[in-house]
């Protein structure tokens, strides 16, 4: 049995070493998880930097919008200047009409004068009429050009006014969208603050529950230790009771063997009976205390389970609240995604219109190749507008490059967020593995504790059996000595048996705690009395009996040393089991702390993902606004090119009119050369020329 007990102890020590190695592995896994969490915090800081960069880029974009607004104001001022120029053109047109009316009056005067002066001044009149016709034709051409130019300028003015109105409407829409986005941002910030407060409350409740659980666990350990002490005291008292009952039986046997010293034996029996009653009372008190401690232990366990259930219930409720908030936020994100899709469809339609406008521009460029010159004033204005368009195009290109940079930064931040999510998943998996390992370690710890308890019980049983076997062997030796000795040595043999029993009682009293010290002192006094009696009996007996008693005492000392070594081994095994239990509990607390640290990191990662999505949406809206501005600027450029083409067409019409006027003047000169031979025909021709 002792060898089996030693084997069990070795197996328990091996299991304890395995548990220690597993706890070391779990500690390594926790260290890896801490390292991963450190990397996650670094990545979160980098994401925060990227978010700050994106915010700065958004501020730059708002500055660009402000600059575009200023440019719009400048374009409006230029439109006002063009309107003033149009008014001047209308005034010049009025002057030309006045000159034309004056020329008609002069022609009428010349006609009247020609009618009065007669044929003598036909040639002069013809020359004056030709000059006047040329002048009238030039005036008409200039007037037509001015009218066409005024009409084109009026159309340009109307178009520019319409564009300005469209731009103002778009600006108002953009401002309304910006205000809506700011309101949404404020609402989201309020929700985030509310979530933070709720998370802080949940964390405070969880910390409080864990502190209470730790306090209850410490009280539970104290109650367990107290119960173990009471159990040990109870076992010690049982051993003492057994020893006293054995002593009482031996005394009764002595009384049955002989009637000598009956008075002393009767006193001793009464004394032992009183001591037995006292020990029985102490045993009952110990049992009552043990029952009280067990009741306290059950009460503490019930309170601990109730507290654990309440904390789990609160955590589940908080998790449900967070899940509901997360679903609401997901719905908002889906609605925003739908709006983004509609805006992307409108953007595709704008791309189609842009392609159509590009085709129209190609056709207009083919028409521009056939034109020759542009009027000076319109050319200057066109150059100014082209310079402005180039500046706007360069600004748009800069904004597009900034947009590409922002898109790249957003993509980088998204990749970082994905990497963070992967790392968080890995950390979560590692924590789950650590949790499973912790549970396995706890199961092994409970199995080891049960095994140690069983081994302790086996050890106690084996020790008791060994002590009883040694006791029986000693009794057999004493009986052999009784058979060899004479009747005069009976008292000495009984005293030796009493010494052996009292020595076994002393060994059991050494294993008990300080509460059993009083009973051991009483037993030691009894041993002293019996030793004095034994010395008296030895004085009466022979020297051979003394040698045998010495041998028996040496054997008793050896047995005591063996029992002490076995007790030390058992105590060491119990200490090792308690140390492993403490290590497992510390590991469980560290895993719970890591779980607490991981939850705020997950929350911050989710918040950063939400902020990234918002920034991405804002970037897409800014891109759409830029595309609308760019399309409007291109439309203005197309309209300006149309105006330029109309100016060129007017100039070509002017040249054609001049050519027709030159042809008409040539025919008039040929009619004048035929005038002397036929005096009346020239008049009719000149009249027709005037009508023409």
From Swiss-Prot:
Q: Does the keyword Zinc-finger apply?
A: no
Protein origin, superkingdom:
Eukaryota
Ranges for region Disordered: 1-27, 48-71, 307-422, 506-529, 644-692
Localization in the cell: Cytoplasm, Myofibril
Q: What is this protein called?
A: Myosin heavy chain
Residue ranges, compositional bias (Polar residues):
11-20, 506-524
- Which residues fall in a compositionally biased region of kind Acidic residues? 1-10
Q: Which SUPFAM superfamilies match?
A: Myosin rod fragments, Tropomyosin
> Chief localization class?
cytoplasm
Keyword annotations from UniProtKB, A to Z: Actin-binding, ATP-binding, Coiled coil, Cytoplasm, Motor protein, Muscle protein, Myosin, Nucleotide-binding, Thick filament
**UniProt region (Rodlike tail), positions on chain:** 1-692
Q: Which organism is it from?
A: Podocoryna carnea (Hydrozoan)
Give a GO molecular function annotation for the protein. actin binding
Coiled coil start-end? 25-670
Q: Where is the composition biased (Basic and acidic residues)?
A: 56-70, 342-359, 398-418
Which InterPro entries does the annotation name? Answer: Myosin_tail (IPR002928), XRCC4-like_C (IPR014751)
- Which residues lie in Low complexity bias regions? 662-675
Mind telling me which GO cellular component terms the entry cites? Answer: bicellular tight junction; myofibril; myosin complex; myosin filament
What does this protein's UniProt record list under function?
Answer: Myosin is a protein that binds to F-actin and has ATPase activity that is activated by F-actin.
